[in-house]
């Protein structure tokens, strides 16, 4: 059957209608010719009884021995170290200070007894009977002047009151070195050491510092200065000598 459509419809509209009609026709065709399969009836199930076979006993499980843990080894005893003995450094004993020399006692003046002066004998007048050749009598010497008294001179020069001995250098004592130092110095009116000089030292640069340090503390009697005083200081392992 054909439709007489007016010619005024455009081609796109016709094409769209044709496509929709084809789709609807295809769906109708498929629904009519579809075969619906019916499920087949259930078949009986045959069951055959079978006698069970002799069951074998299950294999014996191995006996698991308990694991014995080894005893822990005893820890080694820590032996405490013996305390170290303290090293005692024996310092050299200070040498005794020299005792001040005792002051000399002033000597007592001993007065000598005065001699008696006898008057000289007057000469006799010459006798006319005496021989003129006779020698004139000698007169005794005049002893009018008294005998000279002994004079006591006061000691002169510096007099030490305190002389500190120099300390023995530790290095020289360790090496058992002995030596000698000769010095020259002045003594001031207040009894102190001035112008200290080292004249010689054997061995050199070993004992000089100790000598200077000790002599700065020396004291002399005040009011008795001196210049150019020389002295020798001997360092011996058994002691220090000051000459």
From Swiss-Prot:
Transmembrane segments: 13-30
A molecular function (GO) term: energy transducer activity
InterPro entries (alphabetical): TonB (IPR003538), TonB-dependent_transducer (IPR051045), TonB/TolA_C (IPR006260), TonB_C (IPR037682), TonB_pro-rich (IPR049924)
GO biological process terms on file: protein transport; siderophore transport; transmembrane transport
Keywords on record: Cell inner membrane, Cell membrane, Membrane, Protein transport, Repeat, Signal-anchor, Transmembrane, Transmembrane helix, Transport
GO CC field: outer membrane-bounded periplasmic space; plasma membrane protein complex
UniProt keyword Methyltransferase, yes or no: no
The TonB C-terminal domain, residue ranges: 153-243
Membrane topology: Single-pass membrane protein
Comp. bias intervals (Low complexity): 134-156
Cystine connections: none
Region annotated 8 X 2 AA approximate tandem repeats of K-P, chain positions: 91-106
Compositional bias (Basic and acidic residues): 82-96, 104-121
NCBIfam families documented for this protein: PRK10819.1-2, tonB_Cterm
Function: Interacts with outer membrane receptor proteins that carry out high-affinity binding and energy dependent uptake into the periplasmic space of specific substrates. It could act to transduce energy from the cytoplasmic membrane to specific energy-requiring processes in the outer membrane, resulting in the release into the periplasm of ligands bound by these outer membrane proteins.
Assembly, per entry: Homodimer. Forms a complex with the accessory proteins ExbB and ExbD.
Protein name per UniProt: Protein TonB
Species this chain originates from: Klebsiella pneumoniae
Gene from which this protein is expressed: tonB
């Amino acid at each position: 059957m054909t439709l007489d459509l007016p010619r005024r419809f455009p081609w796109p509209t016709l094409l769209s209608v044709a496509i929709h009609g084809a789709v609807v026709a295809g769906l109708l065709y498929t629904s009519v010719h579809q075969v619906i399969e019916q499920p087949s009836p259930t078949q009986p199930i045959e069951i055959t009884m079978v006698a069970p076979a002799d069951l074998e006993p299950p294999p014996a499980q191995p006996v698991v021995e308990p694991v014995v843990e080894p005893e822990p080894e005893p820890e080694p005893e820590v032996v405490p170290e013996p305390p170290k003995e303290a090293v005692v450094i024996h310092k050299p004993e200070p040498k005794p200070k020299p005792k001040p020399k005792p002051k000399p006692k002033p000597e007592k003046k001993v007065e000598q007894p005065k001699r008696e002066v006898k008057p000289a004998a007057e000469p006799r007048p010459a006798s006319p009977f005496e021989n003129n050749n006779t020698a004139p009598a000698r007169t005794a010497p005049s002893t009018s002047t008294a005998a000279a008294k002994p004079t006591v001179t006061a000691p002169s020069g510096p007099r030490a009151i305190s002389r500190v001995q120099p300390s023995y250098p530790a290095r020289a004592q360790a090496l058992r070195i002995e030596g000698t130092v000769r010095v020259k110095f002045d003594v001031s009116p207040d009894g102190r050491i001035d112008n200290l000089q080292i004249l010689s030292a054997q061995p050199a640069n070993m004992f000089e510092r100790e000598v200077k340090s000790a002599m700065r503390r020396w004291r002399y009697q005040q009011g008795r200065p001196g210049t150019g005083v020389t002295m020798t200081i001997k360092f011996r392992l058994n002691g220090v000598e000051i000459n």
